[in-house]
């Protein structure tokens, strides 16, 4: 099952998404584009289980972290009643 995790440049470097991820997909890396001087990165997307806890934890108005579920997951989600 393959999910993609995208971190946008609206990230404020708060680390909420990193702490929320149960499978350690995300980590913080140095970045000069925000006050915190760090941004979330997703180096281990193969470990993503698609729970979207990172999205829920993101405090920005435009979610800085988005999880795009793989085709198998979205297909099985359509079977629910």
From Swiss-Prot:
<feature type="binding site">
    <location>
        <position position="17"/>
    </location>
    <ligand>
        <name>[4Fe-4S] cluster 1</name>
    </ligand>
</feature>
<comment type="function">
    <text>Apoprotein for the two 4Fe-4S centers FA and FB of photosystem I (PSI); essential for photochemical activity. FB is the terminal electron acceptor of PSI, donating electrons to ferredoxin. The C-terminus interacts with PsaA/B/D and helps assemble the protein into the PSI complex. Required for binding of PsaD and PsaE to PSI. PSI is a plastocyanin-ferredoxin oxidoreductase, converting photonic excitation into a charge separation, which transfers an electron from the donor P700 chlorophyll pair to the spectroscopically characterized acceptors A0, A1, FX, FA and FB in turn.</text>
</comment>
<dbReference type="InterPro" id="IPR050157">
    <property type="entry name" value="PSI_iron-sulfur_center"/>
</dbReference>
<dbReference type="GO" id="GO:0016491">
    <property type="term" value="F:oxidoreductase activity"/>
</dbReference>
<keyword id="KW-0472">Membrane</keyword>
<comment type="subunit">
    <text>The eukaryotic PSI reaction center is composed of at least 11 subunits.</text>
</comment>
<dbReference type="InterPro" id="IPR017900">
    <property type="entry name" value="4Fe4S_Fe_S_CS"/>
</dbReference>
<feature type="binding site">
    <location>
        <position position="21"/>
    </location>
    <ligand>
        <name>[4Fe-4S] cluster 2</name>
    </ligand>
</feature>
<keyword id="KW-0813">Transport</keyword>
<keyword id="KW-0603">Photosystem I</keyword>
<protein>
    <recommendedName>
        <fullName>Photosystem I iron-sulfur center</fullName>
        <ecNumber>1.97.1.12</ecNumber>
    </recommendedName>
</protein>
<keyword id="KW-0677">Repeat</keyword>
<feature type="domain" description="4Fe-4S ferredoxin-type 2">
    <location>
        <begin position="39"/>
        <end position="68"/>
    </location>
</feature>
<dbReference type="GO" id="GO:0009522">
    <property type="term" value="C:photosystem I"/>
</dbReference>
<keyword id="KW-0479">Metal-binding</keyword>
<keyword id="KW-0934">Plastid</keyword>
<keyword id="KW-0793">Thylakoid</keyword>
<dbReference type="Pfam" id="PF14697">
    <property type="entry name" value="Fer4_21"/>
</dbReference>
<feature type="domain" description="4Fe-4S ferredoxin-type 1">
    <location>
        <begin position="2"/>
        <end position="31"/>
    </location>
</feature>
<dbReference type="InterPro" id="IPR017896">
    <property type="entry name" value="4Fe4S_Fe-S-bd"/>
</dbReference>
<feature type="binding site">
    <location>
        <position position="11"/>
    </location>
    <ligand>
        <name>[4Fe-4S] cluster 1</name>
    </ligand>
</feature>
<keyword id="KW-0408">Iron</keyword>
<feature type="binding site">
    <location>
        <position position="58"/>
    </location>
    <ligand>
        <name>[4Fe-4S] cluster 1</name>
    </ligand>
</feature>
<feature type="binding site">
    <location>
        <position position="14"/>
    </location>
    <ligand>
        <name>[4Fe-4S] cluster 1</name>
    </ligand>
</feature>
<dbReference type="GO" id="GO:0051539">
    <property type="term" value="F:4 iron, 4 sulfur cluster binding"/>
</dbReference>
<keyword id="KW-0560">Oxidoreductase</keyword>
<feature type="binding site">
    <location>
        <position position="48"/>
    </location>
    <ligand>
        <name>[4Fe-4S] cluster 2</name>
    </ligand>
</feature>
<keyword id="KW-0004">4Fe-4S</keyword>
<dbReference type="GO" id="GO:0009773">
    <property type="term" value="P:photosynthetic electron transport in photosystem I"/>
</dbReference>
<dbReference type="GO" id="GO:0046872">
    <property type="term" value="F:metal ion binding"/>
</dbReference>
<dbReference type="InterPro" id="IPR017491">
    <property type="entry name" value="PSI_PsaC"/>
</dbReference>
<feature type="binding site">
    <location>
        <position position="51"/>
    </location>
    <ligand>
        <name>[4Fe-4S] cluster 2</name>
    </ligand>
</feature>
<keyword id="KW-0602">Photosynthesis</keyword>
<dbReference type="GO" id="GO:0009055">
    <property type="term" value="F:electron transfer activity"/>
</dbReference>
<keyword id="KW-0249">Electron transport</keyword>
<dbReference type="GO" id="GO:0009534">
    <property type="term" value="C:chloroplast thylakoid"/>
</dbReference>
<feature type="binding site">
    <location>
        <position position="54"/>
    </location>
    <ligand>
        <name>[4Fe-4S] cluster 2</name>
    </ligand>
</feature>
<dbReference type="GO" id="GO:0055035">
    <property type="term" value="C:plastid thylakoid membrane"/>
</dbReference>
<keyword id="KW-0411">Iron-sulfur</keyword>
């Amino acid at each position: 099952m393959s999910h993609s995790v995208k971190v946008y440049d609206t990230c404020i470097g708060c680390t909420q998404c990193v702490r929320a991820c149960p499978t350690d997909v995300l980590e913080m890396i140095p970045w000069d584009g925000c006050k915190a001087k760090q941004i979330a990165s997703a180096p281990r997307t193969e470990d993503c289980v698609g729970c979207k806890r990172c999205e829920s934890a993101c405090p920005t108005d435009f979610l800085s972290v988005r999880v795009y579920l793989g085709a198998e997951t979205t297909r099985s989600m359509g079977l629910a009643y």
